[in-house]
Amino acid sequence: MASTRRPVGARTLLACASLLAAMGLGVPESAEPVGTHARPQPPGAELPAPPANSPPEPTIAHAHSVDPRDAWMLFVKQSDKGINSKRRSKARRLKLGLPGPPGPPGPQGPPGPFIPSEVLLKEFQLLLKGAVRQRESHLEHCTRDLTTPASGSPSRVPAAQELDSQDPGALLALLAATLAQGPRAPRVEAAFHCRLRRDVQVDRRALHELGIYYLPEVEGAFHRGPGLNLTSGQYTAPVAGFYALAATLHVALTEQPRKGPTRPRDRLRLLICIQSLCQHNASLETVMGLENSSELFTISVNGVLYLQAGHYTSVFLDNASGSSLTVRSGSHFSAILLGL
């Protein structure tokens, strides 16, 4: 019968198994090594006996046991050869080709609990009430300093309290109106509008700083933030930023114009200056000639200045004419913080 051929890996495993079996079975001392059985010697072939005083011949030491660690290291070294080698495994993986298509989806889970539409509507109403309350609190904070006592606007019931008596259609309408408003404009932190309390006399060839203002209690007037000194007429910037400033003066001539042509240098200058230094700092200025002016006229100036925190601005009137002037009460001065 033809002998079967074992692969190299099988022979390696058999050798390691033999070594492991030898670990538990020690070779007895009386046993002779394999292949050392005495064979019959032919006549005359006996070796001569050694002399009596000669040293004894060295004997071959017999192995009584196998070290387990050496056997395991041999097994590990031999396990990477043959069919278990890394190169052969890598070549086998490359021959597998592309993976197949994904399998079918698993079974669908059980359906969740049934929630009635009434419960969903109540939860939606609660969410809508919370959103409306949050919006009202923000609007109240934004408009707390905007209204004046003279506005006399009647108090209304908050919309969040009105939701309790509204039907679902009204709730949806309120939600749509809230979303249609879009993003709100940023809050203005500093602004004012004041008027001159009484008439102010300005002598000829004089530069006069206006003061003695008051806050009008009319619809549309506003005052928000600190910094306005009504007595001195100076507005101190609470924070550094860009400020839009405006001033409008109603001016009356107190003296009758002299006979003859008016001199070209008879003019008025209206200025808004920083720290009362109109020549050194940036300022807003308007120049008006008096050649064709009437006895009562209006002069205005407006623009944007950057103010540092703690710096003040005020209104100046430069009367570069040959007659005195009167700034009428009701002339106004205003400012608003545009941004930082």
From Swiss-Prot:
Bias kind Basic residues: ranges: 84-95
Glycan attachment positions: N229, N281, N292, N319
Additional note from the record: Mice with thalassemia intermedia show high levels of Erfe expression, contributing to the suppression of hepcidin and the systemic iron overload characteristic of thalassemia. May have cardiac protective functions following ischemic reperfusion injury, which are enhanced by exercise-induced expression and secretion from skeletal muscle. Erfe in the blood may act on cardiomyocytes to reduce apoptosis and macrophage inflammation following injury and therefore limit the subsequent area and amount of damage.
Chain intervals with Pro residues compositional bias: 40-58, 99-112
Identification of the protein by name: Erythroferrone
Family: Belongs to the adipolin/erythroferrone family.
Recorded consequence of changing S321Q: No effect on secretion or protein folding
Subunit structure: Homodimer; disulfide-linked. Forms trimer, hexamers and higher molecular weight oligomers. May form heteromeric complexes with C1QTNF2 and C1QTNF12 and, to a lesser extent, with C1QTNF5 and C1QTNF10. Interacts with BMP5 and BMP7; the interaction inhibits BMP-induced transcription of HAMP. Interacts with BMP6; the interaction inhibits BMP-induced transcription of HAMP. Interacts with BMP2. Interacts with heterodimers composed of BMP2 and BMP6 in vitro, the interaction inhibits the heterodimer binding to its receptor BMPR1A /ALK3 and thereby suppresses expression of HAMP.
Induction comment: Up-regulated by intracellular increase in cAMP levels, such as those elicited by forskolin and epinephrine treatments, and increase in calcium (ionomycine). Up-regulated by exercise in skeletal muscle (at protein level) and blood plasma (at protein level). Drastically down-regulated by fasting. Up-regulated in skeletal muscle by refeeding; the extent of induction by refeeding may be dependent upon the muscle fiber type, being much higher in soleus than in plantaris. Both glucose and lipid are equally potent in this induction, in the absence of any gut-derived hormones.
Residue intervals of the C1q domain: 185-340
Domain of life: Eukaryota
UniProt xrefs under InterPro entries: Adipolin/Erythroferrone-rel, C1q_dom, Tumour_necrosis_fac-like_dom
Effect of N292Q: No effect on secretion
Mod. after translation: N-glycosylated; required for secretion of the mature protein.
